Regions:
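Substrate-positioning beta->alpha
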Residues: 145-155, 164-187, 194
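NAD(P)-cofactor binding segment of oxidoreductase domains
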Residues: 60-94, 127-130
Length: 232
């Protein structure tokens, strides 16, 4: 059974898509962003948006919570600020990253694969996961996210587009609408499982994806740059 309200801590790309899907089910949506600039287009679309941190907010009782605010070295800022209120939520969902698995050398990662975060961000994500799992939340580990305005098709149209090449490195991906659909289903089914990898099963090098996108648009592929020369 779907909730009557969604409250998204971090009303970003995925949360917006989920809110649009749930609107068709009669679910109201509200949430937070960090800046007035981010809030402006969301308010124009009709969503109830608050600025946080910086303003006091009270999530509505019995709402489904979706958390995607970036973690810090102490874990999730939302967890620290709202742990006491989390028991009033009808569902808790935390958006994490497949980066918590670390470098598997092209191997597959499954939900039961041991975590081996390498970057500071991934280490922080793993810590935040632990916090939300302690409250019974669903954790969704996401790969590269694409969709309208954020796809390889958009990138190859950019005047300064380039292909960063790192031999042997492959990524899985997920379309934003597929992620939102999975989140909606998780709200309905309330599975006893708590960790979900939402991604395709056709991992590919990032540069090959851009080449394919250019071919679809009858454009020349962007120039290639070795990763050690990319100044990332």
């Amino acid at each position: 059974m779907l909730p009557t309200q969604l409250f998204a801590f971090g009303f970003g790309y995925v949360a917006t898509e989920l809110a649009r899907i749930l609107k068709a089910d009669g679910v109201m949506a509200a949430g937070t962003v960090r800046s007035a600039t981010s809030a402006e287009p969301l308010l124009a679309e009709g969503w109830n948006i608050s600025l946080w941190p910086g303003h006091d907010i009270i999530p509505p009782d019995n709402a489904a919570w979706l958390i995607s605010v970036p973690p810090d070295e102490a874990g999730c800022p939302v967890f620290r600020a709202f742990e006491a209120q989390a028991s009033s939520a009808s569902w808790l969902g935390y958006l994490s990253t497949t980066g918590v698995y670390g470098d598997l050398g092209g191997g597959w990662a499954f939900e039961e694969t041991p975590l081996n975060p390498q970057s500071r961000e991934a280490i922080n994500r793993a810590r935040a996961e632990e916090q939300w799992l302690s409250l019974g939340a669903n954790v969704f580990r996401l790969p590269g996210i694409y969709g309208p305005g954020r796809s390889a098709l958009d990138r190859v149209r950019e005047p300064n587009a380039r292909r960063i090449v790192k031999p042997g490195q492959v990524f899985s991906r997920a379309h934003v609408s597929d992620i939102a659909g999975a989140l909606r289903l998780a709200m309905i089914q309330k599975s006893p499982e708590h960790i979900f990898n939402i991604c395709d099963d056709e991992p590919a090098p990032a540069d090959e994806v851009l080449v394919h996108a250019a071919q679809l648009l009858n454009l020349p592929p962007p120039p290639s740059v070795a990763i050690e020369d990319a100044n990332l």
